[in-house]
């Protein structure tokens, strides 16, 4: 696989107080990312056999295949992202910890520690907190009390606009606290009511039906999208790539921007890929049957962007 990467180092944006600016974007050039290898999350086949039903996977993942797929996934990331940080194995967390996006959300000032709406994932927040401290990534806030939210329900439309999905994984108390914690960082805080869809046990996030690929390009599954939100995107001048129903179910709507109009997705979503290419995007694919489709977590779920510039 050939990558148009010249090996140059990308420079972080500095603020006047000489602090790093962290990620408040879904599409700018990805410079630093946190991931978790399936060797650390899935552990081994025996562990998967015991756990996959409890965590509501579609089927039992094949451990060796998962490791192989992840190698391909990481090789694409490595050609664009100068710094990839790996979460360590932990006996405190489960196999869903492969999806490093959900326990935390980065803002321009640092990290917000979340508490998953999926009870089995709530221990991930504490493990993540320790890791961020070790890496000296500032933590600017943490959900408390009854608040629950997943990172997959929080998207940056631009540096100053945040949209949060209100569904089974993110509740009103979390939205209240997130508003307070981001008050000095955003100009617009948009609450998007999510549909019941397949029910409480299924994982429907705001990011299930929208992926930003550039400031004016998004991959969407409009059938699940509230009318006001779809209209808002169009009014903001964002071109919508419409994912067909069959490809929605194979994670065609889950697209990770490595840079504006440079992205990666699970292979096999040909219609969506073609539309992206027609919009001028470079698309990389990885075989994600074990690490993505079976756990319904695409490339945006597998990654937690720390710095984008």
Task: Report each predicted region and the residues it spans.
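The feature marks the mature, well-folded catalytic cores of soluble enzymes
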Residues: 3-309
């Amino acid at each position: 696989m050939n990558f148009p990467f010249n090996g140059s180092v990308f420079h972080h944006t500095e603020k006047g107080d000489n602090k790093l600016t962290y990620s408040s974007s879904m599409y700018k050039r990805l410079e630093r990312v946190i991931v978790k290898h399936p060797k650390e999350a899935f552990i081994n086949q025996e562990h998967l056999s015991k756990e996959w039903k409890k965590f509501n996977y579609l089927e039992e993942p094949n451990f060796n295949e998962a490791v192989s797929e992840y190698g391909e996934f990481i090789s694409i990331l490595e050609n664009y992202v100068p710094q990839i940080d790996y979460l360590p194995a932990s006996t405190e967390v489960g196999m869903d910890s492969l999806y490093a996006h959900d326990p935390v959300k980065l803002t321009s000032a640092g990290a917000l520690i979340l508490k998953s709406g999926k009870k089995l994932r709530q221990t991930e927040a504490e493990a993540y907190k320790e890791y961020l401290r070790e890496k000296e990534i500032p933590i600017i806030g943490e959900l408390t009390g009854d608040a629950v939210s997943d990172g997959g329900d929080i998207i940056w439309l631009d540096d100053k606009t945040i949209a949060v999905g209100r569904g089974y994984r993110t509740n009103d108390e979390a939205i209240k606290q997130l508003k307070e914690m981001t008050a000095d960082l955003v100009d617009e805080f948009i609450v998007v009511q999510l549909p019941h869809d397949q029910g409480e046990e299924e994982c429907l996030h705001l990011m299930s039906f929208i992926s930003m690929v550039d400031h004016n390009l998004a991959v969407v599954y409009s059938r699940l999208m509230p009318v006001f939100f779809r209209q808002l995107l169009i009014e903001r001048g964002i071109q919508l790539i419409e994912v067909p129903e069959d490809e929605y179910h194979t994670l065609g709507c889950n697209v990770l921007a490595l840079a504006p109009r440079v992205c990666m997705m699970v292979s096999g979503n040909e219609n969506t890929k073609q539309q992206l290419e027609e919009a001028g995007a470079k698309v990389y694919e990885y075989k994600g049957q074990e690490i993505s489709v079976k756990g319904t977590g695409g490339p945006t779920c597998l990654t937690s962007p720390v710095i984008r510039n």
